[in-house]
């Protein structure tokens, strides 16, 4: 057999020397019929997925991590073998974190990401712990792990994930309070204020603890308060739940790229966060519905994360800014 050209099956014009998992590759040459095996690195293609004739062969790149990376393509037919340098891109494991970092012990939550299946993060193989407390893995897909937080899980402890194809576990935070910049139990706090109440169609106080009645979600933890918007804003009106300045710790200001701004959101399934909702941090604007897809937590608390390197072009003042002027007098 002989290989003269390799292209993607859906783009026969441009020759390639590598591909991604699940790409369909077209191999052109001579004596390519009567195929015995096709391998990318040491991963063999399922024979049922190969189409071959004398001058052409079609084969998908298997979605499987190689045991040995050789950066070679191997073809064996009944008439002999041929190989050619060919690089398959290995996708990295992506772990976004817990959907709710403050899930209470005994409750169920989800870890989101991608390529969990490739790295052996499955119901059978995954070892998920909070400290030494073992989490029960209920379900696992390519992009989600559903698990139960153990009853003896402790706050401010790393959650570790070890898959069957991982050399080392990955750690993500669980109930890590970090550097707290807002305390809704002391709302609006030093340097903060709300000016929404000047509009007659706005609620005067948005601070809740979950005991107000139907429709009010339970707080993340017992005794914790939260802000809730429930109502309508009239034409040319707006609802500012909080505004002011914050004190940023010096170590955060020195290396913003190492930190995320995290907060929890809970939406009614019928009222997701669309493009009319926003959080402003200096010149940075977080608009959850900017992509056209609103954020909907379907009645549960979800952790939102904004990389601080996205805020104010990676520049944060450790002492905050000047307090807003008092124009009420």
Locations of regions flagged by a protein language model:
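Beta-rich carbohydrate-recognition modules and glycan-binding surfaces
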Residues: 173-329
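A short beta-turn/strand-edge loop motif at beta-sheet boundaries
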Residues: 31-36, 67, 116-122, 153, ...
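Beta-strand/beta-sandwich contexts
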Residues: 1-34, 79-123, 166-190
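Short, surface-exposed loop/turn segments at beta-strand-coil junctions that are enriched for proline
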Residues: 61-67, 148-155, 311-314
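Short, aromatic- and glycine-rich surface loops/edge beta-strands on solvent-exposed regions
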Residues: 67-79, 155-165
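Extracellular Ig-like/FN3 beta-sandwich strand-entry sites
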Residues: 66-70, 106, 154-156, 256-258, ...
